[in-house]
Each structure stands twice: as C-alpha cells, then as structure tokens.
Amino acid sequence: MNLVPIAWRNFCYRALSSFLTTLSLALGVALVVSVLAVYGIIREAFVRNASVGYNLVVGPEGSGLQLTLNSVYYLSQPIENLAFADYMEFFSQEERAEMVRQYGGDPELGTRSGRYHDYMAGGFVIPLALGDYYGQHRVVGTTTAFFENLRHGPDVDQPFTCREGRLFEADHPENGVFEAVLGARVAANMKIGVGDTMNPTHGDPEGKGHGQGFHVVGVLDPTGTPNDRAVFVNLEGFYLLEGHAKPIPEDAIVEPAVREADDDSPTLLTIPEREVTAILIRNGNLMYAPLLQSRIQEDVGIQAAAPIGEINRLMDAIVGPLSVALLAITLITCFVAAVGVLVAIYNSMNDRRRDIAVMRALGARRGTVTSIILLESLIIATVGGLIGWAIAHAGLVVAGGFIEERTGVQVGFFSTSQYEWLLLPFVVGLSLLAGFLPAYSAYRTDVSQNLSV
C-alpha cells in the first residue's frame, strides 16, 4: 500500500488547519534562514574582501583593526597620517631619487634605498590618502597603481573595469591631475556619470566643499567589494586641494622640483608637504611578508597589519559568540515550530478516530496507521521548510540593494550560509519526533469503540 497519497489527502482534507500549521512552520524557518544567511554572507564578504591582491596594510601606529576597517572597508576614521618619507622607505635608491627630482625635497632621501625595500622582492606599493567625502562616500586619493595591480572576485583574479568611461591617468593632457573614477554605488546614489564634475567635502560628509573639482572620467563595474562605495581620485590632485598640504618645518631642507621651462602645469606638493593615510603592500615573494611585517613593527610610529588576520580576530571575538546566540535562536525557533506541528496533528486526532478505526477494520495494521500520521508530519515539515527557505531568500533579494549599499556585499537568491543546509533536515527530524505522540495515539485507537460512534 502506498501511504504517501493517503497522507497527502489527509493533509489536503484539513486544508485550513494544514495551511496554518505549515505557514507557522514556514515563518519560523524563514526567520532562522534569514538570520543565518545574513550572518554567513556578511562573514564571508568580510573575509573575502580582506584580500583583494595585497597582504599588508601599513599605517600609523595604533589599532590594526581600525587601520584595516578604514583602509580596506572605508568604515572607520583614519588613525592619523604617515609622512610621505615613510612611503618612500619601500623603494629603491633610484626610485627615491626620482621622487626627490619630481616633487622636490631633501636630496639626502635619494642617496639610499628605503629600509623596507629589500623585503619587497619585486612586489607593489600603493598609497592611499583619505579624509574627504563626496556625499556619504569616501574619497580615496591614490595612484594608477591601484587599478593596475589590485584584483577582485572570488579568486582575486579579476581586474577593475569600467562600465562607462575609463580609469584616470597620472597626468591627462586636458584634465591634468584632477580626474576621478566612481564606484558603481556612488554613481547610482549620487546620480552623476562621465563628463560631470564632483567637488569633495573636507573631513566630513557635511563639511565645506573644495573649490577645486575633479572631472569624472569613469564609472567602475560592480565588484561586490567596498570599492563600489568609494570615489577614486588622482593622488596628486588630492594633494592640491585646500587644506591638504602639511606645513613645512622651518629646519627642513627642500630642494625645488626639476621642471621643464615650458611646463605650465600646477606645482606639485614637495615631499615634506605630503602625507599618506595608509599603504597597501604585496610582496613579490609572500615568504617575505611576515619578515616585512616584523621589521615595520620594530619602528616607532608605524605599523603593518595583515587584513585577513585582523578580520579573523574580529570574527572570533565578536561574531563567534554571536554565532552561538544564533544557534540558540535556531534551536528554540525549530523547537517551537515542532511543537506547533505536534499540537495541530494531536488536536485533529479526535476528529480522525473514526477514520482510523475504519482503516483498521479494512485491514490496515497499527504500524500502517502510525506511518500515515508520521508522513503527515513529514509533509508539513518539508513543505513548510521549503516555503520558509524561499520566503527568506526572496526577502534577501528584495533587501539586496540596501545590503549592498551599506556593506558592499552582493546578495543573490541562492546566497547561503554553511549552516543553512543543515536546517531543513533538522526541522524535518524535529517534526517527525513531534509526530510520534499523535502517531502513538492513532496506534492505540480502539477499533470497536470508535466504529460504534
């Protein structure tokens, strides 16, 4: 005898009761799935975005986590700034001498290699200058090396590309050093695009706007990273904005930059006037990364943080205990849902005793009747679980734009957490256990007594 159609007909016969029980279970599952999915997506995104092609972030001495959140995720305020001379410590003697010639500064800086240069092994160094905003979005002053060297995507192998326009140039014939590239979310939120001019505000989203604007020359394709929420401008243009030049000490030795006679471009800041907020580092040989980090930590006023390590510590310290709380919520919610299944089926047993007695009189065994009741529990759990999963993920899709805008995380219908796939079997198992009490009641149904009713 095929018991599944019988259990399904019983489920459909009591349509209202079955619907309410299934809906209650579905809403419970939807709540749990939503919490687990958001937790899993955010955790995965934080860890994934901690590695976008570099392995160290260098900045002023202080909290490594704050440095990571500020430089990688654009979520925290900068600690302080580093002198441009600290940035030069990663370069060879020839490169340092060229910087002195190009910008102007103490000639002694160009007579030696930087103290960290030997640890680079042919890697790359990318400066970041932060502090300005465009609306609620961070303005990031950097060089063309940012887009040339960094990658994104699940395998960190996808270069930055433009949905519209192009990446900024070091010195454009028409725009000079005042070019900007917008993250995808910035362009959507601020309603600007290629050909427009954007004027950053100094130090605060509500601060005073700079008189000098940047020509928008490109809009990045969405990357699913915090870079979607940033505005990237030429570092040299960033330095030339009002209030960005550091006062030169009276005892500083500054030789002027070497300029062509017919060069009518703006005079760039000298080395003592320059500062960087953070430096992104990738060693050519990753074996040197721990050595470089240790070497930097030996110096005063500067630190090197490994973004992945900092984020993992954050997850262990905050998200770890949170996951235990989420597990407790999951267990309680699933238990309540199972109790709902038990109550619904058990309350229907009085109305079904005659039906059960008829089945027994027609030759059905006690085990057969018991199995039908358990199958009803299984149907309610399976249907409710699947509907709840679908409701939760549909909600995530609806809220996807808000989540991406706030966190830079792209959410799809099938974005799931590692614990989520264990939820449905767990709910089904609990519902089967809950079905044993009404099934036992059906097992003990007296045939003669209920047929005479």
Which residue ranges define each predicted feature?
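A short amphipathic helical element positioned immediately N-terminal to and/or at the very start
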Residues: 3-12
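Short, strongly hydrophobic transmembrane alpha-helices
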Residues: 17-41
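Internal alpha-helical transmembrane segments of multipass membrane proteins
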Residues: 23-25, 323-344
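Hydrophobic, regular-secondary-structure patches
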Residues: 36-149, 268, 294, 302
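Mechanotransmission and gating elements of multispan inner-membrane complexes involved in transport
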Residues: 94, 204, 208-215, 219-323
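Hydrophobic secondary-structure segments that place a key small or acidic residue at a functional site
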Residues: 128-129, 133-145, 153-254
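Transmembrane alpha-helical interface segments in multi-pass membrane proteins
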Residues: 333-340, 346, 350-400, 422, ...
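Short helix-loop junctions at transmembrane helix boundaries
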Residues: 386-426, 436-449
